[in-house]
């Protein structure tokens, strides 16, 4: 792992949380810093998940510091699964760390699947978070309600696979159309080919992510070959 990749242990409410921070070699004046949350801990979800990893590389290629971490009970993280309640505290711990590392820099909360459910919910209510990215929101899973997004007016990008087995396209379109007007105005929904995991189409997903961020932050650097570690 090179000098701008840092393996760390965050201070969490249930104990230490295993994490990796990728930061640009020149991090002075970065326009935002990102937390990226992984999929369901009970179904082999970790910060090394391929969707999470590719999204992290896309952020890194734009010069955005990105923090991935393992939720409680995953990998070397202490604690145990808490049905999303304690995992919200884990996200807050990650945001706290980024806020200390990059004072006064706006934060981006992002996540894939379960990680989107938890990460965006915390991000909607945290004043330090100015924008959100959700990948593969499993809205058909009634155990993971995304109703909070209906009133969340922070700028957000939601990227879905056209054949997501946990969120039918027509159902997702209806879901997003039911947002409050101010939330609709702040939300961009993009469908790309592929299933829930964007299998065979990760490049399309990351291209959408990059374009949205470059549109919002023209001062971001042009994409460069992303991290490989």
Q: Where are the regions a protein language model picked out?
A:
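N-terminal cap/lid segment of alpha/beta-hydrolase-fold proteins
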Residues: 1-29
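Short, surface-exposed "cap/lid" segments of acyl-processing enzymes
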Residues: 26-70
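Alpha/beta-hydrolase active-site loop
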Residues: 51, 81-101
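Catalytic histidine-centered segment of alpha/beta-hydrolase-like enzymes
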Residues: 79, 194-206
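Gly/Ala-rich beta-loop-alpha elbow adjacent to hydrolase catalytic centers
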Residues: 111-119
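Short beta-strand/loop motif that positions the catalytic acidic residue
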Residues: 152-153, 158-160, 164
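Acidic catalytic loop of the alpha/beta-hydrolase fold
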Residues: 162-167, 197
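Catalytic histidine neighborhood in serine/cysteine hydrolases
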Residues: 178-197
């Amino acid at each position: 792992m090179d000098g701008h990749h840092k393996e760390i242990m965050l201070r969490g409410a249930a104990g230490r949380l295993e994490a990796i921070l990728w930061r640009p070699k020149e991090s002075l004046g970065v326009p935002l810093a990102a937390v990226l949350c992984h999929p369901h801990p009970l179904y082999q979800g970790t910060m090394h998940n391929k969707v999470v990893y590719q999204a992290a590389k896309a952020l890194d290629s734009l010069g955005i510091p990105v923090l991935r971490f393992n939720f409680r009970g995953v990998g070397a993280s202490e604690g145990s699964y808490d049905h999303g309640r304690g995992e919200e505290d884990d996200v807050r711990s990650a945001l706290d760390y980024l806020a200390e590392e990059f004072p006064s820099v706006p934060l981006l909360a992002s996540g894939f699947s379960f990680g989107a459910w938890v990460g965006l919910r915390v991000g909607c209510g945290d004043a330090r978070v100015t924008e959100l990215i959700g990948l593969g929101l499993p809205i058909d899973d009634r155990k993971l309600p995304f109703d909070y997004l209906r009133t969340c007016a922070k700028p957000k990008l939601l990227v879905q696979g056209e054949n997501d087995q946990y969120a039918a396209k027509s159902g997702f379109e209806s879901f997003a159309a039911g947002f409050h007007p101010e939330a609709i105005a702040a939300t961009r929904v993009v469908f790309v080919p592929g299933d829930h995991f964007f299998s065979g189409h990760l490049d399309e997903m990351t291209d959408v992510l990059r374009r949205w961020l470059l549109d919002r932050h023209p001062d971001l650097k042009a994409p460069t070959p992303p991290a490989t570690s």
